[in-house]
Amino acid sequence: MPHPLLPELETLATSVAADQGFELCGIQLLTHLAPMTLEVHIRRSNGVDVNMDDCAGFSGTLGEALESAQLLTEAYVLEISSPGIGETLSSDRDFQTFRGFPVEVVHRDRDDTEQRLEGLLLERDEDTLQINIRGRIKRLPRDHVLSVRLTSPGS
């Protein structure tokens, strides 16, 4: 069950991100850690890669906004990062941005059995997801695809 403050935190982070030319990709509040941790994933609205300076600058601005809003009353750690290895791709933009990157695809086959494939992401359109597995193109019906996750080369 998501933390009750998560919607407010997401709204605040989305607003701060938009003001700085970023998009919010994800947010999590990890209350089981001491101190609790607010993880925020951002990317540039124009598609340019996010670097460490971007994350540091965004962290400062979001940190000030969080303090002003007084949403978190306990000690917390603020972690800012950009999507990378291990991230699940979901939006059309994700699939455009990470074309040619290694991915793990979890899908259901004709027998409704869950299968995992690894290859290079080629394309996702309205009907199919295409990956390159050792030089062969595999087309999967999009409605059979359960998840697509970035992996590291050769993993």
From Swiss-Prot:
Its main location: cytoplasm. Belongs to the RimP family. This is Ribosome maturation factor RimP. GO terms for cellular component: cytosol. Keywords: Cytoplasm, Ribosome biogenesis. The gene is rimP. It is found in: Cytoplasm. Transmembrane segments: none annotated. The keyword Chloroplast does not apply. GO terms for biological process: ribosomal small subunit assembly; translation. Required for maturation of 30S ribosomal subunits. It comes from Parasynechococcus marenigrum (strain WH8102). Pfam families: RimP_N.
